[in-house]
């Protein structure tokens, strides 16, 4: 989970980008950017389910308005095979940072070395103590009726030095977690890497700034496939690479904390206009190598899927103008397309190639062939949206961060002075469900309608009075989730191939540079009472929502959805 950055382009720079994503756009999944893609239109013939349309909620203004009873989503709006679940990541919940042979990660080092960079000067040493309390997490999932748990593997827990000898205690921990999930009829979806690179590799050669990490990541992925692949059938190679690159190597507010000299970060010895692209390039190469290995050696029966989870922000033009309309397109390119287009067609968006120049690395033909069509499934992490406002390319504006390269600003208020949606408990999340629907339709119309899971979606309570007087009465989170689940249904009704919705997060966790001051969980973690788990109102709603008997849900016959019956929850 993280705040997302904006992006942009001068409309005269690349004329092919003048059409908005949608009915006037070329389908980039079908368009071949290189000869490598002539036989790789994997998602071109997907079946689109028809369904009973949900009743849309009333538009959201600058304040919260209560949903009508018929607008609150029901489980029987969705096919019986649509998956509801929750997500977490290793560093944010596990704790046990140096137990049972685990090596330090970049986040261990960052929090211990630069505690002032965390808003409440905390760290993930204990976090929610899920390393010891994982059975309580599984119980919470079961109590809510969730069918999926998406979690990540701590690289340095199973490979303390990042490569070489495997730590069996780490393997044992994840085996116990996976087995417990399966015993409780919960499907594990595993993220191989969620920002916590082994510090040993950072010290050895600079982590993701060095191409050597591609082979080391491949070894790490193989350890995961070999030890867990008999039970884990759904994998995400990387989580939110866009946010990672921007925050870790651009602004430097996340581990390893690098930025350009003269900027305010932990390690002002980097290059905020070049290093984010270098790290991102190596992430994509590592993804391609891991996918090739997976398909050649660990999916011989074809019953497993692999992909990537992308952070996405919705965008609207700041005002009704050609320039802001194009700014919106560039913002989407820099936010989503940076990592999506390489795994779809084998190269970066045209707008990025035009504006970034030689700071953006190039792929070889062989690398393009490995990257193109390399995702069986895709995850979208959606929280909020912004207005995108054009910035002229001129001597008056000099990019200092990689996010400036897009020549567009992200605005919370439109040209009329109104917020894009109601502000939630977290300063950066404005509720705008339409942004999620729009993005899903872009995936359908521009990118070939790949199978999508909403792998993160939620809001935080701020852990201080008066914002969070009763941590269990999270009515704003409940309203937010209900509206966004409805937004997913709206996209499905328009043909988007969405397969599941996973709330972020299962439990309150260490929220990176915000420490424990922002609580995203469906389940409250009482740190004053041994990290005891307590279901919030939103969790209890999910328990009711998911309680509809399977026999009353929709069934699929001849690729068309038929509603057997309908119940209210």
Swiss-Prot record:
Changing residue 427 to F: 77% loss of activity with DIBOA-Glc and 30% with DIMBOA-Glc. Signal peptide: none annotated. A beta-D-glucoside binds at residues 92, 194, 239-240, 383, 456, 504, 511-512, 520. GO terms for molecular function: beta-glucosidase activity; DIMBOA glucoside beta-D-glucosidase activity. Residues 1-50 form a transit peptide. Acts in defense of young plant parts against pests via the production of hydroxamic acids from hydroxamic acid glucosides. Enzymatic activity is highly correlated with plant growth. The preferred substrate is DIMBOA-beta-D-glucoside. This is 4-hydroxy-7-methoxy-3-oxo-3,4-dihydro-2H-1,4-benzoxazin-2-yl glucoside beta-D-glucosidase 1a, chloroplastic. It comes from Triticum aestivum. The gene is GLU1A.
């Amino acid at each position: 989970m993280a705040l997302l950055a904006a992006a942009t382009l001068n409309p005269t720079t690349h004329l092919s980008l003048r059409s908005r994503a949608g009915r006037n756009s070329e389908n980039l999944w079908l368009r071949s950017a290189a000869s490598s893609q002539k036989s790789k239109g994997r998602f071109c013939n997907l079946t689109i389910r028809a369904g009973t349309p949900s009743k849309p909620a009333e538009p959201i203004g600058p304040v919260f308005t209560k949903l009508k009873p018929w607008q609150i989503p029901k489980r029987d709006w969705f096919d019986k095979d649509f998956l509801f679940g929750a997500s977490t990541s290793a560093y944010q919940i596990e704790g046990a940072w140096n137990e049972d042979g685990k090596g330090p990660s970049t986040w261990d080092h960052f929090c211990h070395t630069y505690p002032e960079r965390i808003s409440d000067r905390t760290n993930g040493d204990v976090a929610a103590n899920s390393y010891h309390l994982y059975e309580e997490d599984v119980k919470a999932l079961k109590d809510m009726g969730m069918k999926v748990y998406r979690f990540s593997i701590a690289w340095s827990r199973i490979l303390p030095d990042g490569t070489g000898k495997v730590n069996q205690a780490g393997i044992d921990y994840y085996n116990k977690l996976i087995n417990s999930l399966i015993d409780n009829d919960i499907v594990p979806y595993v993220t191989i890497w969620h920002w916590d690179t082994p510090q040993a590799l950072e010290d050895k050669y600079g982590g993701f700034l060095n191409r050597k990490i591609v082979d080391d990541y491949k070894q790490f992925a193989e350890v995961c496939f070999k030890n867990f692949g008999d039970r884990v059938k759904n994998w995400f190679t990387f989580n939110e690479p866009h946010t990672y690159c921007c925050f870790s190597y651009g602004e430097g507010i996340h581990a390893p904390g690098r930025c350009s000299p003269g900027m305010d970060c932990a390690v002002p010895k980097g290059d905020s206009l070049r290093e984010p692209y270098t790290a991102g390039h190596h992430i994509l190469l590592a993804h391609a190598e891991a996918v090739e290995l997976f398909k050649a050696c660990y999916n011989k029966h074809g019953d497993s899927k692999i992909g990537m989870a992308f952070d996405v922000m919705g965008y609207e033009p700041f005002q009704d103008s050609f320039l802001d309309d194009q700014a919106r397109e560039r913002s989407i390119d820099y936010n989503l397309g940076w990592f999506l287009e390489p795994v779809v067609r084998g190269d970066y968006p045209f707008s990025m190639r035009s504006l970034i120049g030689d700071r953006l690395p190039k792929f070889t033909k062989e690398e393009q062939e490995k990257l193109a069509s390399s995702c069986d499934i895709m995850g979208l992490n959606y929280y909020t949206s912004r207005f995108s406002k054009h910035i002229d390319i001129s001597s008056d504006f000099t990019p200092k961060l990689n996010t400036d390269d897009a020549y567009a600003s992200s605005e919370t208020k439109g040209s009329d002075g109104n917020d894009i949606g109601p502000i939630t408990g977290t300063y950066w999340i404005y509720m705008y469900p339409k942004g999620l629907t729009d993005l899903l339709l872009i995936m359908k119309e521009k990118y070939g309608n790949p199978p999508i899971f909403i792998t993160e979606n939620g809001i935080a309570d701020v852990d201080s009075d008066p914002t969070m007087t009763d941590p269990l009465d999270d009515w704003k989170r409940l309203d937010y989730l209900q509206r966004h689940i409805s937004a997913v249904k709206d996209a499905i009704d328009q043909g988007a191939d969405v397969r599941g919705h996973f709330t972020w997060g299962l439990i309150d966790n260490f929220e990176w540079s915000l420490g424990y001051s922002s609580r995203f969980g469906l389940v409250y973690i009482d740190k004053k009472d041994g990290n005891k788990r307590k279901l919030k109102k939103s969790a209890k709603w999910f328990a009711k929502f998911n309680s509809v008997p399977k026999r009353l849900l929709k069934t699929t016959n001849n690729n068309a959805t038929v509603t057997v019956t309908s119940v209210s929850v």
